[in-house]
Amino acid sequence: RSTPIKSSAASDVYKRQTSFLSLSLGFSTAVMIYMSFANLFASSLQTLANIHGKDDGTLHSTLSFFGGIVLILLIDKLIPHYENPHEMHRVEEMSLKEERKTEIKPQLLRVDVVTALVLAIHNFPEGMVTFLAALKDINIAIPIACAIAIHNIPEGISVSVPIYYATGNRKRAFWLSFLSGLAEPVGAVIGYLILAPFLNDHVFGVIFGMIAGIMVFISLDELLPAAEEYGKHHHTIYGLVAGMAVMALNLLMLC
């Protein structure tokens, strides 16, 4: 008799969790998009216009913006469809696919390693983006870091679940996901070491334009679809409105 009650309770908990996740992802989407256009791209325009003049500065900023989109698009295209953390997959789909993989023992290691490497490649530019933004303005970097942290939650799930299904080992799934996540601070250090000798106002203007493009692409390609997938449409909209309001208030307070 208690089974229906337990099922109902579990269903309610699941709905609350997915609703909160949908709200959070909508919030993160708004933060990243609003930040991209109202702050990053605007900073890129102003910086490059001061150096090259209004017309050439606008051209350089626009090219930087779409250059960032092309860069993250190429990274996505180089990663196989199923193993790409940007691609949405249902749990049932992952379960069936991983069950088929577990039938062949030698493939288990490949599943683990490839999945971890894919997430590491994906996280690398995110760490670089956050760190370089912090070098210029910590007030820009903090919202970026928070938005990236939120969007990494479903991404981590999409990586750890297939590993768990492939190996049946929760610790292995956790540690491989954790190690692949370390690519972000590594990306920050390597990005700084490579770009440090060249950092000037022009480079920062280009970088901010590219960061804006990357963040807009990630928001539209990953966060918004994930928000719709995990919860109801209106929860996503509530999150979007709240995220824009918070960012607008934050920028007004900084003025």
Which positions does each model-derived feature cover?
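Transmembrane alpha-helical segments of integral membrane proteins
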Residues: S36-Q46, M215-A227
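Intrinsically disordered, low-complexity non-transmembrane regions of multi-pass membrane transporters
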Residues: L78-V111
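A generic, lipid-embedded transmembrane alpha helix
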Residues: G26-S43, E184
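Generic transmembrane alpha-helix signature in multi-pass membrane proteins
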Residues: E99-K105, D112-I150, P154-T167, A173-S177, ...
